[in-house]
């Protein structure tokens, strides 16, 4: 487990989260996507959750690089995944992309641009042959890194749980976007192959 703060700065009962202070800085608008509105309702992903992540944004200067390193360390355990990556890109370039991707999460602006960017990433992964199960499994590394990180911040256990829940909801939402984009792209590729026959 990484330690971003000293032991004296750890868990307390003093409130830490101030979502009302950050709620005006977040943006949640998926009105162009009827199904996504339903998905957000099922997840109970709200502006309140985004405000929690926004408040944590200043702390992510050290967190995000750690998440990126741990993410690629877990991927490197699979020779097949490394072969796909090395065949199509460079790890350093992908690390920069993931760094931006994670920064966007803590920027707490979920809108059309955010959604379309995630869909593009998923389509690229389909085209390079990265199967959805590997992409989805890699999200666990991000979740584990976040949980380790949140335990280093001085806040009541209840608020830690709220922060983990907020991050988990966004990650789950992203996984749903990825699965849907994978399905659409795989269907498009199948249709193209059938048209060639």
Where are these regions (language model features)?
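Long, amphipathic alpha-helical coupling/dimerization segments that relay conformational signals between
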Residues: 2-31, 42, 47-48, 100-196
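Short hydrophobic/aromatic-rich motifs at helix boundaries and adjacent loops
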Residues: 42-45, 53-54, 70-75, 93, ...
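SIR2/sirtuin-family catalytic core signature
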Residues: 37-40
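Structured interaction and signal-relay segments at domain junctions
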Residues: 71-72, 76-106
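Short, charged/polar micro-motifs that form catalytic or ligand-binding hotspots
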Residues: 54-61, 84, 88, 92, ...
